[in-house]
């Protein structure tokens, strides 16, 4: 039995996907993907599977474990891990090209991170300044 493990990162969320032969089940942290809420996060996770097609989707089972970050960061990390797993599973360069043409961050990741807050400005943000008064 063939098993492939891949990872995906987005902001502070890290996802680990395990793909194996199966019947098309997708589980996120042990829950079926069908019950993941909100809906936008669910569709984000399923994007690579929809693009790959039903034939590939129904021939594999995917288990994803995600931790860290918020719900959207986790969804996008899971999406990256699933896309990488599908490309590795099929070994199909056409699928890889399809993913890259649709959305490059599906395989490559997004390097942007939040800017650290600077000293003496408390919770206002990294670039907030006190308003200057001339009188």
From Swiss-Prot:
Pfam families: Ribosomal_S9. Residues 108-135 are annotated as: Disordered. InterPro entries: Ribosomal_Su5_D2-typ_SF, Ribosomal_uS9, Ribosomal_uS9_archaeal, Ribosomal_uS9_CS, Ribsml_uS5_D2-typ_fold_subgr. GO terms for molecular function: RNA binding; structural constituent of ribosome. One of its GO terms (biological process) is translation. Signal peptide: none annotated. Residues 108-118 have a biased composition (Basic and acidic residues). Keywords: Ribonucleoprotein, Ribosomal protein. GO terms for cellular component: cytosolic small ribosomal subunit. Coiled coil: none annotated. Residues 119-135 have a biased composition (Basic residues). Belongs to the universal ribosomal protein uS9 family. This is Small ribosomal subunit protein uS9.
